[in-house]
UniProtKB/Swiss-Prot annotation:
One example GO MF annotation: 4-phosphoerythronate dehydrogenase activity
Subunit structure: Homodimer.
Pfam families reported in the protein's UniProt record: 2-Hacid_dh (PF00389), 2-Hacid_dh_C (PF02826), DUF3410 (PF11890)
Top-level EC class as recorded in UniProt: oxidoreductase
Recorded superkingdom: Bacteria
Protein name, per record: Erythronate-4-phosphate dehydrogenase
Annotated HAMAP family: PdxB (MF_01825)
Listed GO biological process terms: 'de novo' pyridoxal 5'-phosphate biosynthetic process; pyridoxine biosynthetic process
Bilayer-spanning residue ranges: none
The keyword DNA-binding is annotated on this UniProt entry: no
Entry's Gene Ontology cellular component terms: cytosol
Amino acid sequence: MKIIADENMPYVDVLFGELGEIEYVNGRTLAPEQLADADVLLVRSVTQVNEALLCQNQQLKFVGSATIGTDHVDTAYLKSRGIPFTNAPGCNATAVGEYAFIAMLELAQRYRQPLKDKKVAVIGAGNTGTATARCLEAYGVEHRLCDPVLAAQGDNRQFYELDELIAWADVISLHVPITKGGDHPTWYLFDQQRLEALKTGAWLLNCCRGEVIDNRALIEVKQRRVDIKLVLDVWEGEPSPMLALVPLVDIATPHIAGYSLEGKARGTFMLYEALCRVMGKTGENSFHSLLPPFFLGSMQVRELGDERALLTLCRTVYDLRDDDIHFRQSGTDRLGFDKMRKNHRHRREFSALKLENAKGSEVNWLSFLGFSNVG
């Protein structure tokens, strides 16, 4: 069995090597002739999977995408050909939620405005939005959710209207899929009018899709309104962001908010499990066997004096400033953007760090934030 896999997808050898012959490809430049004799295709969001890509293949048995979203896959076409498809919903939700939370702490420290004093709007309450809200809940930050799609589907959480939240929130964190049609399109959800409506001193974070914000309008508004603080992990026109925008952003990274080792491993492992089911096999690998040990065995934390101490603890696991610096130095062009994503292998989630003697102490809440608690 021939398996075509994106070269930037981790743990493919370990997991899929037992199932067939693996050939790695550049997911962004993948061509139909490269898939002519493939049995399995494993992709990320940079590959458009559609009839044009698969036109030379008549034997494909499985397509897997190690992503939360599916907007890059023509699922209707795959269904018409009887090709099983799976993605990895929620695989990197924890990583995205922790990224957003750390970014808020970084802004709070930089501008001496405690996050605890902020009101946060989480726009999009799916996997990543829920993970962000979970971090805010653990720390005791007032927050509200907006998700008209989930509200219409009967989700029993309390939701608010978007424009109501724009007027209310000090911080807005975006976690929606990109859609152009339907009752609630998200393409340019934040257009010039909504950007102008942001509260004085508002923080705007985008960890979902670049085109959820009109980036040209954002440049124009930000040049006039220096009070607005920006965190952008995603950009309109990726992998070539508008260069005029980058210097205006407080924290800038190349679409790596979900790029933790745990998230990457979880995504690939979910595809492995799905393919095993399609083949009627029992997988021989386990998820936890994929992860290397954290550089710290454990840490004693009996108290956190202030928000700076919390940020220091978070930086022990992931220092977002490093990626911001690296991106500005070498990641803003097409090649640098993709290279940084490809080589991003250092990020861990809070759960990698074990806290000793935290149970029953005043920092027991850190387990709800995601840190491992060993007693």
